[in-house]
């Protein structure tokens, strides 16, 4: 298989934000080295902190993709070709290297940047070792420094970790070699390239520490930081002490935080599991009373125990199994970092308890694996399978690597037992996909029983440089052969059964595999560790066996995270950490001005007349707030008691965008929030006739408009008014203190140069980019552009600018919509396919569906109505107006079925690509024993052009199904829907 990288909207938005905030090239520079071919062009505002850029992206959302594409984009737009990527550790360096050098990444980027390649130069420990008595520079450093801009198709990238960058090898200047520019110092040589620096994981590079200072030493013109977290700075003391994130421009230029990532389905949901202890075991706990480099003091009630380096914790309590010792330097031998006040529970160290976690992890793995493998499980036309991987974090390498190691023996015993039960179950299954799964299980059994099993593998820090070929093969599979791990079969058709991985913390950073669905922690990580980072290896959305990335609305996925009882508050801490990342912190005591503005801004999109006065009046009338806008403690509305803040969030769920939605992270021991909603089958059966039609596949047949493409090419590519020469800007910069004297701001004034224009693109490149963006054949583009260049443009290649390109693309999209918006019809094909809720092969509806494809907000107070499409409560909806209003309404008896449709329930094809589904369905019984089906698409009054297109598309499609008594309506308010339903009921 090959992983297929796709352009995701949030990644495109990130790239756009970076380029919008980039200061551009300084075409007015008087520097004598401005045209130095071994260095980047001079950047406006270079070496100035305010020109630097911060990009905040949550773990698992693709920051490596973004900064890799950014390098291609800056090379294409600005001619910048020398980048230094600085990472905090060798593990992250390996991860970045694997992505940039992967075939799938190169193939993906080649479609946008033809004939351009990244020359990745990686500096590793040992590269500076002298050979034959001579101290030479590493070849990778030479390649980077001596790369010339005259090689216009190559981007030179130096990838280095922090320790290496600040090492003596980089600072020394006594090498037996002189680089271009006359220097013998690696640091000075990099300085001469005038690099753009990309920092990965900026929280590991606080600006007052050595790691960051080593970056400043190479004198980057601009620094761009990418990370989920950023370093903090503290000012003041005592009650005046303030700690805040240290951003270059006081806030990130792109901010995709944890809340948005989870709420918008950009990462997996999380389920937290842990086996319970007996009451006696749970109460038996020891507190770290003090911990020093050579001494640990544990306390239980009034009794204390002093342990020195090398002392075994079993001397304190036999429950501490596994030869756990105090290793010194505030760490146990299992690498658990200790701090005063920590609690240690011996029961969680017992082998029987560890075995429980392993058993639960295996059970959870196969529960998820069966769902991912079978998926639709039809007789034919099955969707691609998804490989399921599990990751175990363990204490001891010997317990896994040794043939008789306890962990390995226990895991294999439990796995064999589980496989035997599953094989016995699937021997009686008959569907094709079920038979395939039986083959997969039997292949797993065979491999596990062989001398060289290929079912599980481990990677540990101690494995680096191991001479054991079998271990090295395991390590290579885990670190480098991502596509092999994600594949079900090799090129010879043999099953790839490896899917259980073991590590200490070596795989905690830098490594990722999107198909990790289970993480089991057989070791505690300590209280200071980032909880998001711990689950981070399993957050990425998975890919199927074709390499396609699976979005949450297509196939909802969750990470099963198994921990010990001693971390049972993990879910609460994780939710707290996610919510602390909110752009706006919700005040549960008082309605703040920021909260008011958030509600008003979002409501205005639906109702332009909504104001802050209207909001406050509504809350005041309900008694939710007092005259100081403080929330009242307990309010009774409709017989339900809640705090003022709780009522505010229910009435105005727009605020939920600033906190993690319920069900995204679940502690399975405490909560049973429904992540799936059961269908009321009896109601869906009443509308089955419709879905028998909706499951038919349709193709779009465009009208053959004579010479359309030639006409568009002539009207757009041949339109001289769309061509502009780009004028360089002269930027005058001056530094000024801010009004509060706490910061320095850069004030800029741009002036156009008179009669000076920037050079344009190469002719072939300009033609190719139009072709990629519009689909107009190259032959047509060339014919019209060549003619225009000879006539109106007088052969002036400066007109082949980015401005001209953007004008052409914008005009093409406008003309395409004008010509083809109604110039097509739907043609029914002779086959059917599943929708999100209906299986035509079985002629039946699914039992349940992912709750969030119905709606992201929850109404626990919804009244039971046996005509509704789903079991209640809770009721799911997306917007208060009109969605929640429509769902809460008491309809007349003629309405026999109603409800909100899940996404992809119908899948009306769009001429712009993709599909769309209306929001609501109503079934109305008439007096003459006939029925009418009302499909409703709800939109805001001030709808966007794209929303209007969707309405037009749906109307056109449903008009072809009029014979099935379908009425399609668009509505901007609940009253419109009530009125139409009332009218249809009376006819």
From Swiss-Prot:
Residues 886-974 form the VRR-NUC domain. Its cofactor is Mg(2+); S-adenosyl-L-methionine. GO terms for molecular function: ATP binding; DNA binding; helicase activity; type III site-specific deoxyribonuclease activity. GO terms for biological process: DNA restriction-modification system. It comes from the Bacteria. One of its GO terms (cellular component) is cytosol. The keyword Amino-acid biosynthesis does not apply. It catalyses: Endonucleolytic cleavage of DNA to give specific double-stranded fragments with terminal 5'-phosphates. Its EC number is 3.1.21.5. Keywords: ATP-binding, DNA-binding, Endonuclease, Helicase, Hydrolase, Nuclease, Nucleotide-binding, Restriction system, S-adenosyl-L-methionine. It holds the Pfam family ResIII. Residues 50-545 are annotated as: Helicase-like domain. Residues 915-939 are annotated as: Endonuclease domain. A type III restriction enzyme that recognizes 2 inversely oriented double-stranded sequences 5'-CGAAG-3' and cleaves 25-27 base pairs downstream. After binding to one recognition site undergoes random one-dimensional diffusion along DNA until it collides with a stationary enzyme bound to the second DNA site, which is when DNA cleavage occurs. DNA restriction requires both the Res and Mod subunits. NCBIfam families: PRK15483.1. Belongs to the type III restriction-modification system Res protein family. Contains two different subunits: Res and Mod. This is Type III restriction-modification enzyme BceSI Res subunit.
């Amino acid at each position: 298989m090959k992983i297929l990288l796709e352009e995701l909207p949030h990644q495109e938005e990130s790239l756009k934000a970076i380029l919008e905030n980039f200061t551009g090239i300084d075409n007015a520079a008087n520097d004598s080295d401005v045209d130095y071919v071994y260095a980047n062009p001079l950047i406006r505002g270079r070496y100035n902190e305010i020109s630097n850029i911060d990009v905040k992206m949550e773990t698992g959302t693709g920051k490596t993709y973004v900064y890799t594409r950014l390098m291609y984009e800056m090379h294409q737009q600005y001619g910048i070709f020398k980048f230094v990527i600085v990472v905090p550790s060798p593990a992250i360096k390996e991860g970045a290297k694997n992505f940039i050098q992967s075939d799938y990444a190169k193939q993906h980027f080649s479609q946008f940047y033809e004939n351009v390649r990244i020359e990745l130069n990686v500096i590793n420990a040992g590269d500076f070792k002298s050979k034959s008595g001579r101290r030479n520079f590493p070849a990778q450093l030479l390649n980077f420094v001596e790369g010339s801009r005259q090689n216009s198709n190559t981007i030179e990238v130096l990838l280095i970790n922090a320790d290496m960058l600040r090492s003596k090898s980089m600072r020394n200047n006594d090498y037996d070699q002189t680089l271009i520019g006359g220097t013998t110092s690696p640091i000075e040589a990099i300085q001469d390239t005038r690099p753009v620096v990309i920092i990965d994981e900026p929280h590991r590079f606080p600006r007052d520490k050595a790691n960051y200072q080593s970056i400043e030493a190479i004198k980057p013109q601009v620094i761009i930081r990418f990370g989920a977290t950023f370093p903090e700075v503290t000012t003041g003391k005592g009650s005046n002490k303030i700690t805040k994130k240290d951003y270059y421009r006081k806030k990130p230029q792109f901010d995709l935080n944890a809340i948005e990532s989870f709420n918008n389905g950009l990462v997996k949901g999380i389920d937290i599991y842990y086996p319970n202890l007996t009451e006696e075991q749970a109460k038996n706990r020891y507190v770290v009373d003090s911990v020093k480099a050579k001494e640990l003091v544990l306390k239980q009630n009034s009794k204390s125990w002093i342990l020195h380096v090398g002392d075994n914790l079993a001397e304190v309590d036999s429950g501490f199994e596994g030869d756990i010792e105090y290793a010194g330097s505030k760490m146990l031998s299992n690498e658990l970092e200790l701090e005063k006040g920590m609690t240690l529970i011996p029961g969680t160290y017992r082998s029987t308890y560890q075995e429980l976690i392993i058993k639960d992890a295996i059970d959870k793995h196969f529960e998820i694996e069966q769902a991912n493998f079978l998926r639709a499980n039809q007789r034919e036309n099955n969707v691609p399978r998804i490989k399921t991987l599990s990751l175990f974090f363990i204490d001891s390498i010997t317990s896994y690597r040794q043939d008789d190691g306890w962990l390995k023996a226990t895991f294999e015993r439990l796995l064999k037992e589980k496989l035997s039960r599953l094989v016995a179950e699937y021997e009686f299954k008959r569907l094709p996909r079920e038979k395939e799964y039986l083959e997969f299980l039997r292949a797993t059994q065979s491999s596990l029983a062989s001398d060289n099993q290929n079912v599980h593998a481990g990677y540990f820090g101690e494995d680096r440089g191991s001479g054991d070929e079998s271990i090295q093969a395991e390590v290579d599979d885990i670190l480098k052969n991502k596509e092999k791990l994600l594949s079900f079969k090799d090129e010879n058709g043999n099953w790839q059964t490896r899917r259980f991985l073991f590590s200490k913390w070596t795989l905690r950073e830098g490594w990722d595999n999107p198909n990790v669905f289970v993480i089991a922690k057989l070791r505690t990580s300590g209280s200071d560790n980032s909880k998001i980072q711990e689950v981070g290896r399993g957050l990425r959305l998975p890919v199927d066996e074709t390499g396609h990335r699976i979005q949450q609305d297509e196939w909802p996925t969750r990470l099963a995270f198994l921990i010990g009882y001693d971390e049972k508050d993990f879910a609460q801490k994780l939710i707290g950490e996610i919510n602390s990342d909110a752009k706006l912190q919700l005040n549960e005591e008082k309605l703040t001005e920021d909260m008011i503005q958030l509600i008003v801004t979002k409501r205005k999109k639906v109702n332009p007349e909504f104001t802050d006065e209207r909001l406050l009046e509504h809350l005041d009338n309900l008694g939710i707030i007092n005259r100081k806008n403080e929330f009242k403690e307990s309010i009774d509305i409709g017989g339900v008691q809640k705090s003022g803040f709780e009522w505010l969030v229910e009435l105005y769920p727009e605020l939920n965008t600033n906190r993690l939605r319920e069900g995204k992270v679940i502690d399975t021991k405490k909560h049973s929030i429904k992540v799936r909603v059961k269908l009321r089958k009896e109601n869906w059966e009443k509308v089955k006739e419709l879905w028998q039609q909706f499951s038919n596949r349709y193709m779009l047949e465009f009208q053959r408009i004579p010479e359309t493409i030639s006409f568009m090419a002539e009207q757009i590519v041949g339109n001289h008014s769309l061509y502009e020469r780009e004028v360089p800007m002269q930027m005058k910069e001056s530094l000024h203190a801010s009004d509060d004297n706490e910061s320095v701001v850069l004030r800029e004034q741009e002036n156009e140069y008179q009669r000076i224009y920037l050079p344009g693109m190469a002719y072939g490149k300009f033609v190719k980019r139009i072709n990629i963006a519009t689909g107009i054949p190259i032959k047509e583009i060339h014919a019209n552009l060549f003619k225009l260049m000879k006539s109106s443009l007088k052969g002036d290649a400066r007109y082949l600018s980015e401005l001209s390109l953007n004008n052409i693309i914008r005009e093409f999209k406008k003309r395409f919509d004008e010509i083809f918006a109604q110039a097509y019809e739907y043609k029914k094909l002779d086959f059917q396919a599943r929708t999100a809720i209906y299986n035509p092969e079985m002629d039946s509806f699914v039992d349940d569906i992912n709750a969030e494809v119905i709606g992201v907000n929850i109404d626990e107070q919804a009244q039971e109505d046996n005509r509704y499409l789903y079991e209640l409560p809770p009721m799911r909806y997306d917007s208060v107006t009109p969605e929640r209003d429509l769902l809460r309404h008491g309809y007349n008896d003629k309405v026999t079925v109603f409800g909100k449709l899940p996404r992809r329930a119908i899948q009306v094809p769009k001429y712009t690509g993709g599909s769309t589904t209306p929001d609501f369905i109503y079934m109305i019984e008439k007096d003459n024993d006939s029925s009418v089906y009302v499909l409703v698409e709800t939109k805001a009054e001030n709808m966007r052009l794209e929303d209007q297109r969707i309405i037009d598309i749906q109307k056109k499609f449903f008009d072809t199904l009029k014979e099935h008594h379908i009425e399609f309506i668009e509505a901007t308010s609940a009253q419109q829907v009530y009125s139409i339903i009332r009218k249809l009921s009376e006819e």
